């Protein structure tokens, strides 16, 4: 038995070893295999073998040491768990022998996790379940999970949506205080806010949208003048009814955006607000933030102004009907339009044509990528995929929205504060690949400096008509950086504009809702709860997660739909390649 002196010496030896050990902080990066890496804060990656990956979860912050396993090769040993942010996840309930487990669907957790008897909530084999990490695996590589909720079984109607909501931590139901706030609102709430607003209820504003749209947040009208047109864009004004810092605003921030899942969207605001009291429905007075702007004959923008107004839409028009009117058709529905509305639509088309011509010459137009609508059956699975054809009415609305948003960006830039959409263009880390691509297939374009606004614009314009062995424009488009929100005005390279923001979808996007607050605060001293940098980052992360959720659900539904199709060969074009395979755009609908 060791005496006290020996024990003290042993403890001191352990302390000395620990103090002399070189540890590196970093973040765990999983792979599709059982091994992984730690991305060190100093910028390099350290390999983690399977036995070490068993002790950590994706995204864990850890301290690692390095040990040499053979000459010139090292691997990491997890020395300390600093933080673990992965607390909940989804998976499938499994039983093997006497053990009950969850097979996580979270990327990077490539193992089953044991569920103790008291934490199983009567889940059955193959149930989809929502779980919590009950015991982290750091100490011995044996983690445990706790079932928080049984989501359902594969094959149940709507299981794909329910699973996706749980997987991305998206709330479906409204918190009680939000629902209570929404239920307290009524038509009298609209009337209560009309004092001090311009009365534009007699003006021929109309909405142009899909027939099934209920959350209509923009209405348009236009009149000719000596140098072009006066374009008036009325945007729904939910900020008038929702107090800063109220439960509804906090929940809108938490959701960040409406998500248009096939068959059943997930709104940002309760239906009472988004599809009734603030939606610009026809023949009822509604509150609006209006942008009046001068469109010159050459499509350039002149003076603009913002107004708080009350409008009354003179019609809920479909894209198809407006497109028919533009084409000169004389359908019964077109003949039934009031003269003031028909004349306004004609002026809107002329103004939008000029706006688009100016953007084509001085900025960048986005390509009309093929879009499709998923039609679901009673079991909430795809029964039909049909093309969503973009017509002249879609382009009319797009040009009006872009013009109004450009005015909002310019106004906020003049105020010295705002919320802007910044797009730096091509990714810096792809510069060498882009240079080699251009030198190989378009050497005459390699001279353009894509890091500058003019160089990027020229490069993208020239590649539109480029004939080469490979689709250079398509490849370049996949090298673009992601657009980000920022408090300072900066170029939006993807659109070829010096500054850009959006305020035209306040019922659907919190960033637009917030821009309303900024404009009204600057012009009329309306109250605002300002965002800080941490909140801005959280907002962007939630927006990104929402896009991932929508893509995940659509991919799942499409994969199931593909199983029902005949096994006959179909023709298509390879649209993208990856190390794991490639994507094909089918020629058929």
Give short role names for the model-derived ranges.
Residues 20, 54, 111, 125, ...:
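Electropositive polyanion-binding surfaces
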Residues 1-226, 322-326, 332, 373:
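OB-fold/S1-family RNA-binding modules
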């Amino acid at each position: 038995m060791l005496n006290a002196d020996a024990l003290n010496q042993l403890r001191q030896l352990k302390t000395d070893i620990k103090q002399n050990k070189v540890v590196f902080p970093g973040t765990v990066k999983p792979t599709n295999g059982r091994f992984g890496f730690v991305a060190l804060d100093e910028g390099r990656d350290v390999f983690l073998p399977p036995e070490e990956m068993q002790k950590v979860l994706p995204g864990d912050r850890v301290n690692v040491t390095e040990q040499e396993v053979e000459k010139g090769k090292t691997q990491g040993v997890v020395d300390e768990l600093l933080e673990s942010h992965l607390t909940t996840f989804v998976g499938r309930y499994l039983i093997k022998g006497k053990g009950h487990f969850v097979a996580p669907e979270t990327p990077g957790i490539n193992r089953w996790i044991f569920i103790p008897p008291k934490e199983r909530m009567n889940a059955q084999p193959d149930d989809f379940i929502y779980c919590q990490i009950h015991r982290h695996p750091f100490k011995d590589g044996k983690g445990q999970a706790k079932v928080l909720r049984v989501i359902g079984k594969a094959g149940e109607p709507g299981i794909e949506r329910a699973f996706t909501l749980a997987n991305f931590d998206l709330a479906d139901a409204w918190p009680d205080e939000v629902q209570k706030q929404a239920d307290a609102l009524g038509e009298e709430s609209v009337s209560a806010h009309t004092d001090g607003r311009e009365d534009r209820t007699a003006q021929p504003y109309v909405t142009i949208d899909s027939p099934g749209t209920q959350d209509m947040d923009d209405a348009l009208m236009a009149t000719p003048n000596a140098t072009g047109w006066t374009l008036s864009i009325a945007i729904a004004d939910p900020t008038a009814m929702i107090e800063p810092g109220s439960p509804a605003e906090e929940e809108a921030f938490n959701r960040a955006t409406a998500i248009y899942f096939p068959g059943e969207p997930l709104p940002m605001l309760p239906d009472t607000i988004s599809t009734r009291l603030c939606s610009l429905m026809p023949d009822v007075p509604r509150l609006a933030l209006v942008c009046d702007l001068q469109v010159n004959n050459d499509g350039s923008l002149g003076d603009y102004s913002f107004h708080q107004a009350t409008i009354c839409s003179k019609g809920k028009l479909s894209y198809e009907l407006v497109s028919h009117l533009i084409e000169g058709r004389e359908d019964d529905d077109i003949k039934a339009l009031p003269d003031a509305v028909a004349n306004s639509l004609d002026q809107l088309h002329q103004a939008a044509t000029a706006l688009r011509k100016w953007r084509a010459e001085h900025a960048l137009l986005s390509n009309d990528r093929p879009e499709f609508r998923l039609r679901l059956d009673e079991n909430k699975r795809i029964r039909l995929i049909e093309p969503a054809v973009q017509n002249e009415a879609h382009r009319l609305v797009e040009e009006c929205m872009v013009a109004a948003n450009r005015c909002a960006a310019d106004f906020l830039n003049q105020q010295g504060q705002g919320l802007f959409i910044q797009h730096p263009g091509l990714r810096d880390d792809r510069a060498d690949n882009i240079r080699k691509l251009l030198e190989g297939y378009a050497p005459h374009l390699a001279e353009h400096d894509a890091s500058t606004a003019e160089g990027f614009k020229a490069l993208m314009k020239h590649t539109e008509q480029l004939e080469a062995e490979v689709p250079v424009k398509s490849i370049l488009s996949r090298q673009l950086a992601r657009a980000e929100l920022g408090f300072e005005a900066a170029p939006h390279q993807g659109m070829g504009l010096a500054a850009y923001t959006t305020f035209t979808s306040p019922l659907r996007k919190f960033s637009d809702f917030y821009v309303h607050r900024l404009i009204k605060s600057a012009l009329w001293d309306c109250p605002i709860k300002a965002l800080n940098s941490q909140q801005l980052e959280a907002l962007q992360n939630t927006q990104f997660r929402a896009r991932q959720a929508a893509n995940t659900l659509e991919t799942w539904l499409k994969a199931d739909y593909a199983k029902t199709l005949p096994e006959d060969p179909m023709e298509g074009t390879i649209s993208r390649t990856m190390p794991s395979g490639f994507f094909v755009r089918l020629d058929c609908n």
